[in-house]
Amino acid sequence: MEARLKELKQKALELIEEAKELKGLNDVRVAYLGKKGPITEVLRGMGKLSAEERPRMGALVNEVREAIQTRLEDKIGNLEKAVIEAKLATETIDVTLPGRPVETGCHHPLTAVVEQIEDVFIGMGYEVAEGTEVEKDYYNFEALNLPKDHPARDMQDTFYITEETLLRTHTSSVQARTMEKNKEKGPIKIICPGKVYRRDDDDATHSHQFMQIEGLVIDKNIRMSDLKGTLQVFVKKMFGEDREIRLRPSFFPFTEPSVEMDISCMMCHGKGCGTCKGTGWIEILGAGMVHPNVLEMAGYDSKEYQGFAFGMGAERIAMLKYGVDDIRHFYTNDVRFLQQFKRA
């Protein structure tokens, strides 16, 4: 058996040396080391050996098998290297050809506008607060001075999931939750960006889903002049130093007094044109002083603390800032539209 093993080893190594292709090496591996090969056959016959011969012959079989396996791996490596070198010798790359340009993406215009608005208010000391889009009726309405029988609920058609659960119609619900969670009942200064949902028919100026950004400030001795000054800073940062604002009386259940804010038309600079319908002004947001009932429901003493709030649609701001005439452009995923907003 020992002589046969030496003969197998010598023959296998000779065949490996003679092989010129990977296929030939694979044939040698199968023939000598495969399940039906002579090495395996020798291993099966080990049981017939005496106890004294078995360890020595076992070691010899392993030595022969490892020698064949090692030589196979070396030869395979050499052949693979030779194949690569042959390809490199015959294949060339023309490095003078111009490279293919890589298409770069860009911020969605709504994302860009929301980030700009956040930056403006963060610069004034505000924090960004977020909340759930699926909201309880209480935080969306009742905590904001809108009880179940309040007629102002008709101002917003709502997507109800259950009798007490809905898709939020504004991010004011985040303000209500923030005030309630503030156990110290101290100052608050937040903006609340997020998606909101209303049962509107989609057209050039309306969408059943849109982005809203609301702001809330609660502190002692807060006045209407603080609200006006804050909005003036925001408008000049977003639309330019030459923009003017005006506040008109309005009604919102959660603020008293309530106002709507207009800015001087950027197309005609207040002279009157088709964009502003000849008025020289364009409405962009609603605001007001936080209603005492809202403060009291959140646990604040309305005689000690006051506040102001405001809310705007990100699409409305983006349409005015970029001259977009149809809100649906923001949601159609038209690359031709989106590519206009690539940053240099």
Swiss-Prot record:
Coiled coil: none annotated. Its main location: cytoplasm. GO terms for biological process: phenylalanyl-tRNA aminoacylation. One of its GO terms (cellular component) is cytoplasm. Its cofactor is Mg(2+). It comes from the Bacteria. Mg(2+) binds at E256. The keyword Transit peptide does not apply. Binds 2 magnesium ions per tetramer. CDD domains: PheRS_alpha_core. The keyword Transport does not apply. It catalyses: tRNA(Phe) + L-phenylalanine + ATP = L-phenylalanyl-tRNA(Phe) + AMP + diphosphate + H(+). GO terms for molecular function: ATP binding; catalytic activity, acting on a protein; magnesium ion binding; phenylalanine-tRNA ligase activity; transferase activity; tRNA binding. Its EC number is 6.1.1.20. It is found in: Cytoplasm. Keywords: Aminoacyl-tRNA synthetase, ATP-binding, Cytoplasm, Ligase, Magnesium, Metal-binding, Nucleotide-binding, Protein biosynthesis. Belongs to the class-II aminoacyl-tRNA synthetase family. Phe-tRNA synthetase alpha subunit type 1 subfamily. Tetramer of two alpha and two beta subunits. NCBIfam families: pheS. This is Phenylalanine--tRNA ligase alpha subunit. The gene is pheS.
